[in-house]
């Protein structure tokens, strides 16, 4: 993995920003999974004058899950390296267990339908991760898919 990857300590509280029409080379965070969507987003932002910075949540790996593919963090780091953009990890392992895995487990045991993506978005992506980005990197812009675009 690229030696430029750094861990960003997770800090609170959150704020949110939106994208302006004229980038002028401004840095903008792309939450990177290493998949096609986030990778293409980073490339398209570069192509339109933005200066994307990849950020990936470090989440716990489930013991014995038998996953043979590399973690998404590794994939994201390789994509960022290939694009020539910085990449950072935010350590979210403990909060992920407490705010996503445990509520999922409890809901499932109680016969309810868990909603782990909502919990992750609320407690990690747009709270813990974004705050770490703002405080540690000083970046004020986060790219998100415009409403109504699929």
Please place each PLM-identified region on the residue numbering.
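ATP-dependent adenylation/nucleotidyltransferase module used to activate substrates
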Residues: 2-150
């Amino acid at each position: 993995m690229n030696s430029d990857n750094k861990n960003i300590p997770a800090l609170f509280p959150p704020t949110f920003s939106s994208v302006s029409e004229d980038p002028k080379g401004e840095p903008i965070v792309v939450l990177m999974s290493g998949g096609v969507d986030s990778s293409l987003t980073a490339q398209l932002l570069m192509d339109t004058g933005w200066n994307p910075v990849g950020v990936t949540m470090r989440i716990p790996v489930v013991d014995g899950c038998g996953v043979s593919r590399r973690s998404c963090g590794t994939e994201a780091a390789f994509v960022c390296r290939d694009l020539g953009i910085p990449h950072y990890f935010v350590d979210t392992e403990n909060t992920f267990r407490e705010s996503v895995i445990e509520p999922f487990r409890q809901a499932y045991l109680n016969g309810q339908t868990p909603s782990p993506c909502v919990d992750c978005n609320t407690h990690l992506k747009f709270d813990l991760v974004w705050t770490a980005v703002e405080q540690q990197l000083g970046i004020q812009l986060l790219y998100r898919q415009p409403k109504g675009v699929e």
